[in-house]
């Protein structure tokens, strides 16, 4: 009986480790020429949920999302906005229905995200840490 419990514990721990390893390090980025420094998780969550439309210095902020099936998008929202995919969909449905706003523009993947953010000083997005190049500046690693 005890060996069965130990086996289950070992399997659970192995699965937890595998799941953690599968998650990449997501970072929040702006164009390298954007003057914004570090931002808090709450400030970024406000921008990505439409509750704020500007960077802390008052300049316009344009959030850009990866597509709804992106694992990076899921990780970003769980870590930053605290919403999973279903909660995010419900949130935006409510906001759209009430006329209070529209969800951020979506891009199809990391390459498009990198291009969109690096070419617009008002853009803010997220990528895996390994996908960052010199055209981008990391403002938060949640």
Where are these regions (language model features)?
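Sec/Tat signal peptide C-region and signal peptidase I cleavage site
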Residues: 19-24
